[in-house]
Amino acid sequence: MSGMRTLGEFIVEKQADFPHASGDLSSLLASIRLAAKIVNREINAAGLGDITGAVGTENVQGEAQQKLDVYANDKFKAALEARDQVCGVASEEEDEAVAFNKELNQNAKYVVLMDPLDGSSNIDVNVSVGTIFSIYRRVSPIGTPATEEDFLQPGHKQVAAGYVIYGSSTMLVYTTGNGVNGFTYDPSIGSFCLSHENMMIPEDGKIYSINEGNYIRFPQGVKKYIKYCQENVPEDGRPYTSRYIGSLVADFHRNLLKGGIYLYPSTQSHPQGKLRLLYECNPMAFLIEQAGGIASDGVNRIMDIKPTELHQRVPFFVGSKNMVRKVEEFLELHRDEE
């Protein structure tokens, strides 16, 4: 990877495009980069130490917390607090938003929402996992503690978002609203290097990603769409390929590169869907729109939804533009059949 730009160099270059930029966002992204390296090191050695498995506690959603969930949450929180650009964080692993109390943090203008380790239950079987993050400007007065209102903002107000995927190689993918860029971690120099510049998702794809084990519980429109994907229509490129890893970051990353759609609809047991709007769906929606795709709850643009609670859930359809539009058509056509 010699000759490639590192993430740090790239951020500085982009900052130079804005003469009045303070550098706070650049420093914040450096904090995320540092925490990602620390978590990556621990994940790579997960099978050698006592860091896999559950800790015996549940998060606010009632999900068993894995040891690495707690570890990643602690490391990202510590890194974000240390640089003084963040006044508070909200996390899947925290019941409530955390306001940083140091005076320097209270003078910061950003809040961060995150899923510190998406897909962590897959660690034990060596499946790719990831970190998802979303950054907003606070709405509360600078110089005061962060409030819940700082976090309950619609996705279109994000100033940056991204994810880290810990897989066969580790990548950090992010956007600040000017395209999507991916950086692969080079352990020989300890840096993320630009490997995927101006990432764009194809308008059409041949991959659909959904947990078909829940088929019987899906809305009728989703069932019909799955059957549509499976039909043998060679001139239309069907049947499509079914690929579902069970880690949002991993499924999203593959579809971003190759074209496809990820679906997590409402079900009988989860009528509001299962994925969280603020720190899973919104950041992925920002990324996919910047890459030329679409993110929807089946009716509405994800980033237009006004959140009412920190851990709010929504149905989620994200990926190639034409594929998301098609599933929306099926949902509308069969809406009265529920």
Swiss-Prot record:
Q: Where in the cell is it found?
A: Cytoplasm
Q: Which domain of life is it from?
A: Bacteria
Catalysis performed (reactions): beta-D-fructose 1,6-bisphosphate + H2O = beta-D-fructose 6-phosphate + phosphate
GO cellular-component term (any): cytosol
Annotated positions binding Mg(2+) 2: D115, D118, E280
Residues given in the record as substrate binding sites: D118, G119, S120, S121, N211, Y244, Y262, L263, Y264, K274
UniProt keyword terms in alphabetical order = Carbohydrate metabolism, Cytoplasm, Hydrolase, Magnesium, Metal-binding
CC cofactor note: Binds 2 magnesium ions per subunit.
Pathway the protein acts in: Carbohydrate biosynthesis; gluconeogenesis
Needed cofactors, names only, are:
Mg(2+)
In the Enzyme Commission scheme, what number(s) does this protein have? 3.1.3.11
Q: Which GO terms describe its molecular function?
A: fructose 1,6-bisphosphate 1-phosphatase activity; magnesium ion binding
Quaternary organization? Homotetramer.
For this protein, the record's NCBIfam families field holds: PRK09293.1-1, PRK09293.1-3
Q: Which PANTHER family match?
A: FRUCTOSE-1,6-BISPHOSPHATASE-RELATED (PTHR11556), SEDOHEPTULOSE-1,7-BISPHOSPHATASE, CHLOROPLASTIC (PTHR11556:SF35)
Name by which UniProt lists this protein: Fructose-1,6-bisphosphatase class 1
